[in-house]
């Protein structure tokens, strides 16, 4: 079951809300159907003995050292960065009061781990939840569920450009983005008590969109390890066309403007080459460029 909650009661947004709800439901259902047929992501508790032992050791040696549980004070608002988290409820005994903690999933850690010699992998969220007793050895696990926060990318320009250089402007803008309002909250639970708990803990607005299902962060499926796929299942890589001359791009665009078509044309032979020439040209005083987003190993950033 999937629950989609909207606090904003505005007739003008009804059509938009319905479209978002339908798309989200289709996305989750199609992934469940696809994974049921192909078994690309297997629950940790369904692994056979040898695979389960390897996964457990991988958790202890590679995953556990980078996890840091943080205590939650229910009387205070949680101001978390955009990302994926686990909320864990524990207690020492039945007579002991309940303790609430969250675990941030580091961005640098793989969301899916391929099992050696197998054509499937395990989810990092499932792996961590399966090993919570190892993390909280002196406490009993009551419940746990993941959630993902997405904050608005919009910032309001209140920067004094005359007093801050470009680097300081960027740093200040990025910090402001991390404090911007939460646009979307994905909750990996359909329990009303869990949804209510997060709604009380996080600084949500009336127009924050809340998704509740058994899955969160399906966008991370794009990072499924390639080794679990057979060659016939892998997408054919498109080779960009090299249409720009091998000579200087500076000389080429002196005669006329040129519109580059990506990814049809080679990005390396157009944009990257243009910036490299600009960096080496002694007549170029400065390079100013606005990037919406970059790849993990961006040549432009390098």
Labelled PLM ranges:
Residues 1-302:
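N-terminal localization/anchoring segments of enzymes in phospholipid and broader phosphate metabolism
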